[in-house]
Amino acid sequence: RFFLDSMLPGHERLNYNVIGSGVSENPDAKPAIEYAEDFNLTYMKAAPGKGPSLHSHDHIEVFIAMTGRWSVTWGEEGQHEIFLEPFDVISVPVGEMRAIRNAGDSDAWHLMILGGTNPSRVEWHDNVIQRAQDAGFVLDEDGNIQEV
């Protein structure tokens, strides 16, 4: 699993870094093409109702629905929502809290494009960090998932 929230029920998913390392909290996650300049590309597959929880980045993130229907929420508490259908695109600004989940009834894919050559780590919403700690997971000083 690539991310702290993917250790929590409802947020399990598969990530495939294609170009560049993207953002990951698992040091074993390696991209197909390591070299990336100015952008990173990742595919994600999620079951119905699952996907990344509320988080932000200090770089631009673009979501492109490839299959299925996706809910994208944003705002400090995820209070805004829009639905993406195949090939719909949304760009989430730097620092904006966002989450995305499969809103369909079967497994679905979406594509993420991250701006920058070396995108920064994920900034999780406080409730995600607390839920992960309650489940026995933290991030170490290097930003990697550790079980406690």
Which residues fall in each region the model found?
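Conserved short histidine dyad/triad with adjacent acidic residue
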Residues: 20-30, 40-57
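Short histidine-centered beta-strand/loop micro-motifs
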Residues: 29-35, 52-57, 74, 81-83, ...
